Structure formats: structure tokens, C-alpha cells
A protein has these predicted regions:
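Conserved cofactor-binding/catalytic machinery of classical short-chain dehydrogenase/reductase
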Residues: 13, 49-53, 65, 88-89, ...
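NAD(P)H-binding glycine-rich loop region in Rossmannoid oxidoreductase-like domains
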Residues: 2-60, 72-76
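A short helix->loop->beta-strand "cap" motif at the edges of active sites that frequently abuts
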Residues: 60-65, 97-98
Length: 191
């Protein structure tokens, strides 16, 4: 049995990242963004360049495993800069550390997460909520504890060189997801 060491670090500080690898056996990359906000926090930097660096360091420091968390559905959304950067990141990871396991989760949710909280806030405040593509986009949300169970399984069963899609038990359209959130916050749906 091992332990998890949580350290705050600037992901653009390669010297600091290298220091973390000296004591590591496994690297799990959970870093990702949904929107480009700040200088430096671009899809390319976060989803492509950083995973490439981490994979190279895994190889250089002879880590046992690299688990890279990507995103589900990116093969079908190639017109999206987000998806392109995720696919590029996956390719870079596998090129630099072929034994890596890539996890592609659907929307990950938990108590007080950004995704759920942001949508609940918007639903509560807006008189009308815009739904694109008639709300038919499908999701299979996965709870964060189920995703961590998957990560544990990958490590404990020595699963290498695989791409694993991670979904929850229920497939919902975006409209159904919003309706569930409305029920949670007690907001009645307008007819």
C-alpha cells in the first residue's frame, strides 16, 4: 500500500514538477479546463503540452504508471478546440509513455462541483435557460467516487496501454439533466 501526496505547484514550473517525480511511483493527471480564461491557461497548454511533459517525465523517472484523465466524446467533436486539444494530449501521452492508461470520463459530478453548481445557479437565476440542439445531447454523468474507483482498479489490476471510457449508470439528454437539476433546487418547469 502506498500513499497520496498532495502538493500545490505551478504546472508551468518544470523544475518543481521534476522534483515531484523524484519521489513518485505513479502519476495521475486530472488537470483540465473547460474554458480558456487566463493567459497561459489555454487548451493547448493544459490538455496537450502539459500531458506530453508529464508522460516524458514518467518515462525519464521510470514511473510504474501514468494515468491520464481525458474526456468522453472527443472523437465526435473534432470541430471543437477543446476536443482537438484533448485528442492531441492523448496522442502525446501515448507517444511519450506507451504504457499509459487513458480514462475518458463523461461529465464528472460531486457535491459542490463547478458543473452542477454553475448549472443550478443559472437555472435558479435565469427566467429562460438556453438549450442547444433541442437539449438532445446525451450524457452519462459519472460520480467522482466511481471515477476514483476506476483509477484504483487500473492501478491495482495493473492495467496498461488502454483507453477506458468511464460513464455513470444512467444516460440522460441535456434537457433531462437540466430537469433533474430543477427538481433538486425546487424550481418548477415553465410550460
Amino acid at each position: 500500500a502506498g500513499y497520496i501526496d498532495i502538493v500545490e505547484a505551478n504546472i508551468f514550473d518544470e523544475k518543481k514538477i521534476r522534483a515531484l517525480f523524484k519521489e513518485a511511483d505513479i502519476c495521475i493527471n486530472l488537470i483540465g479546463i473547460l474554458f480558456e480564461k487566463k493567459r497561459g491557461n489555454t487548451f493547448k497548454n493544459i490538455h496537450s503540452i502539459l500531458p506530453s511533459l508529464l508522460a516524458k517525465l514518467c518515462k525519464e523517472y521510470n514511473l510504474k504508471h501514468f494515468i491520464h484523465v481525458s474526456a468522453l466524446g472527443i472523437n465526435d467533436a473534432i470541430d471543437s478546440e477543446y476536443a482537438k486539444s484533448k485528442l492531441e494530449g492523448e496522442a502525446n501521452v501515448l507517444k511519450n509513455f506507451p504504457l499509459a492508461t487513458i480514462l475518458r470520463p463523461s461529465v464528472v459530478y460531486s457535491v459542490d462541483d463547478n458543473f452542477t453548481t454553475n448549472f443550478m445557479t443559472l437555472i435558479n437565476r435565469l427566467p429562460v435557460f438556453p438549450i442547444y440542439y433541442e437539449g438532445k445531447t446525451k450524457f452519462a454523468p459519472i460520480h467522482c467516487s466511481d471515477l476514483t474507483d476506476t483509477i484504483y482498479h487500473v492501478i491495482s489490476k495493473n492495467i496498461y496501454s488502454k483507453i477506458i471510457e468511464c460513464t455513470g449508470p444512467e444516460i440522460l439528454t441535456f434537457k433531462e439533466l437540466l430537469e433533474k437539476l430543477q427538481i433538486l433546487i425546487g424550481k418548477k418547469r415553465r410550460s
